[in-house]
Design a protein with these regions (language model features):
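Surface-exposed, short loops/turns at beta-strand junctions within beta-sandwich domains
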Residues: 572-578, 661-665
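Substrate-binding/active-site clefts of carbohydrate-active enzymes
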Residues: 26-33, 38-240, 256-286, 301, ...
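Active-site-proximal helices and loops of the catalytic beta/alpha 8
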Residues: 143-153, 163, 232-336, 340, ...
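Carbohydrate-interacting/catalytic domains
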Residues: 5-9, 13, 20-38, 50-55, ...
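Beta-strand/beta-sandwich contexts
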Residues: 516-548, 578-579, 589-602
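Aromatic-rich carbohydrate-binding modules that target alpha-glucans
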Residues: 614-666, 674-694
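Short edge beta-strand/loop segments characteristic of extracellular beta-sandwich folds
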Residues: 456-458, 537-543, 607-611, 622-624
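Short proline/glycine-enriched turn/loop motifs at strand-loop junctions of beta-rich domains
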Residues: 462, 543-548, 615-619, 664
Length: 704
């Protein structure tokens, strides 16, 4: 894998000029509300890029071909930023704007299909001519990020690093680097691509990471050139002002490599790394792998289990206990479930009004989304009631052209009220969530941030519902018959709360009651980055820290570089690593705890290979060791690296696993075999190995 080192210089040299661009500063992303923009279908800001010379004929001015370009671009997004800001959204997630293929991909019926969605890349170093200019420069992207930052908004870019384009037609998966052709899938002399069959078992981690999907050229992130090229592409967009990077198809991309990528971005500047990992629910066979992936790498996942639960619960005959089950389980499993990206629809599923026709119920679902834990995402047009019922609103009919920017629309005004509440109330933006009561059509939950509390009472019943308010009153700290008005002022038929008296909730209603305490109680809202490198700066966000206090990590006192009531900054320790408990003790003796992952050094990808080892049915192989990725000495499967995969691409079928390891560090590790009952056996003698300074690399081990 080190044969490509001469080519790596080409990528690195093209990156030197980028250092002058300013990058995002540390930010509490928990407080963000994201507006998802499907760029081609949002707003046409410049007509001269509709039918550019290098890719003519892919644009449909009539907008009858749903798989053609329709004219939306980065200039259009920039023009509508004030509209998005007024809605109450503090960040935008834009669909991929990287250079996509120039040739059409005709469908089975011979109809022209264009990469209007942005997910069929050819050059990750350039901006597509349909979204920027014919020079494929960053001018329009720079203008967008500057305008967003001037409005105190953030920009998250979508990067489909798993693949290029279809390998069986059009450009045959071609990969370019700043305009220079590198390879395509059919002529892959440098092994930039995987060449395995399509995934047939979506519960097999090896197939998921190394197999192909949708006939797309599957990039090999363990190839040294590809590794460097993709990391530099992400860094290039970061240098041009991107505040976050969405990893498309995260479940299908090398899991260890994504941790290396996130680490490289975190080491440059604070950044939100978002991973798209499709799950049907918390009972999905890949759910535990998703949790481990997020926890160990500090990557925020899209909350598909919650989205699917909400879509089922609010549909006719639904059950709100599905929502409660997901929230409760994820709160237990994720280091910080407030890092999850929450939504009710997006570009890969039918819009919410396609499955719920009742406008009031849709508004109740939006209110539930915007008052629940996580970082909420509003899909473009939701505020205007935008949807198309053709073929049930499935792809591509979930991506209609934005029709209106009416700021007096009912959904727009409701979202404005909800976002204003969320942005001004720490309990709603960052508070821990706890269920007070839940049934098939009633859901009452608490959000608590120190002494600040919000209680949300949702009823989907078609008639009035009685609710014992005793626990609600206790949660809010009400005294006697103290009254709390509905924070939405009845916008969703909400009512006031009077002490612990029994409530009669109106049909199809949502009430929000708040307690904003004057008491100073330490509360940790977020830690950025969530996976830090030893010696690098870490920021703790929250409330009630006072002007001084004590900070400890894994019981060891730390020196801080700054301390304010809402923010503490320190450097991650050099000698402690792994998943560690962080505690803040304010001067008034109030305490708050959270967790932080610390890695030893910048990370490089190492593939460990174990040949000639036979395991019994039901047994799995793990790697334990003294680094964060290997469990930092823990022998628990959730902490160690693994289970190792069986390399189906080899006749010998050795065990293998790509692991993010600290560059240049000496590491002690052991192999261990587990089954459903626990530890079966482990090596008696450790392997003492020096990790490479550069990756990706391969280390072969034998059992000892």
């Amino acid at each position: 894998m080190k044969k490509q080192s001469s080519r790596v210089a080409l990528v690195v040299s093209s990156f030197i000029a980028l250092q002058s661009f300013s990058m995002a500063q540390a930010a509490d992303f928990h407080r963000d509300i994201i507006y998802q923009v499907f760029t081609d279908r949002f707003f046409n800001g410049r007509k001269d890029n509709d039918n550019p010379p290098q890719s003519p004929g892919l644009f449909d001015a009539s907008r009858k071909n749903w798989k053609a370009y329709w004219g939306g671009d980065l200039a259009g997004v920039k023009e509508k930023l004030p509209y998005i800001k007024s809605l109450g959204c503090s960040a935008i997630w834009i669909s991929p704007c990287i250079d996509n293929i120039n040739k059409p991909e005709n469908d089975a019926a011979g109809n022209m299909v264009a990469p209007y969605h942005g997910y069929h890349a050819r050059d990750f170093m350039r901006v597509d001519e349909h979204f920027g200019d014919s020079d494929m420069s960053f001018k329009d992207f720079d203008a967008l990020t500057k305008a967003a930052h001037d409005l105190d908004m953030r920009v998250f870019v979508d990067m489909p690093f798993n693949h290029t384009s279809p390998y069986n037609h059009a450009e045959y998966g071609a990969l370019y680097d700043a305009g220079q052709f590198r390879s395509d899938v059919e002529n892959d002399r440098n092994k930039y691509f995987h060449h395995l069959p399509a995934v047939s078992d979506f519960n097999d981690p090896y197939q998921l990471q190394y197999g192909t999907i949708f006939y797309l050229g599957d990039l090999d992130q363990e190839n040294q050139y590809v590794d460097t090229y993709l990391k530099q592409a992400a860094a290039k967009f970061q240098s041009h002002g991107a505040d976050g990077t969405r990893l498309d198809a995260a479940k299908h991309m090398n899991w260890g490599w994504q941790h290396v990528l996130a680490n490289s971005l975190y080491n440059r500047a604070d950044h939100l790394v978002l991973g798209e990992w499709w799950l049907t629910g918390i009972d999905d066979p890949m759910y535990k792998d998703a949790v481990k992936f997020a926890n160990k790498g500090g990557i925020s996942l899209y909350d598909f289990p919650l989205a699917n639960a909400i879509r089922k619960a609010f549909a006719e005959g639904g059950d709100l206990t599905l929502v409660d089950q997901v929230v409760s389980q994820e709160n237990k499993d994720f280091i910080d479930s407030n890092e999850l990206l929450t939504f009710i629809d997006n570009h890969d599923m039918s819009r919410f009004p396609n499955i719920v026709k009742d406008k009031k119920v849709t508004q109740l679902a939006l209110a539930t989304l915007l008052t629940s834990r996580g970082i909420p995402i509003i899909y473009y047009g939701t505020e205007q009631g935008l949807y198309d019922d053709t073929k049930g609103g499935e792809d591509p009919y979930d991506r209609p052209m934005m029709q209106s920017f009416d700021q007096s629309a009912d959904n727009y005004k409701l979202i404005q009220k909800l976002t204003a509440l969320r942005q001004t109330n720490l309990a709603l933006s960052s508070g821990k969530q706890r269920t007070l009561f839940c049934s098939k059509d009633l859901y009452v939950f608490e959000r608590r941030a120190g002494a600040d509390v919000a209680v949300v009472a949702l009823s989907l019943k078609p008639k009035e519902a009685l609710l014992d308010a005793a626990e609600v009153a206790t949660s809010l700290g009400l005294v006697d018959n103290e009254v709390r008005q509905d924070a939405l002022a009845g916008a969703l038929s909400g009512i006031a709360l009077e002490g612990a008296k029994q409530l009669s909730l109106p049909p199809q209603s949502l009430s929000i009651w708040l307690t904003n305490s004057n008491k100073s109680s330490a509360f940790i809202a977020a830690i950025r980055p969530p996976a830090a490198t030893a010696g690098k700066a870490v920021t703790v966000y929250g409330k009630g820290f006072g002007t001084s206090g004590k900070l400890s990590l894994a019981g060891e006192a730390l020196t801080t570089s700054s301390w304010a009531d809402d923010k503490i900054v320190f450097n991650a320790p050099l000698l402690k690593h792994g998943r560690l408990v962080l505690e803040v003790e304010a001067a008034n003796s109030s305490k708050a705890k959270s967790e932080l992952v610390v890695v030893e050094n910048k990370l490089v990808l190492v593939r460990f290979v174990v040949p000639d080892l036979k395991l019994a049915a039901g047994e799995q192989l793990y790697i334990s060791g003294n680094t964060s990725a290997l469990g930092a000495g823990s022998l628990l499967p959730n902490d160690m690296a693994g289970p190792m995969l069986v390399n189906q691409d080899s006749d010998e079928k050795p065990y293998m696993l790509a692991v993010p390891m600290p560059a240049g560090e000496s590491v002690e590790l052991k192999l261990a075999v587990y089954n459903a009952k626990g530890l079966v056996r482990a090596e008696t003698k450790p392997h003492n190995l020096k990790m490479p300074q550069l990756g990706p690399s391969v280390i072969t081990m034998t059992w000892q």
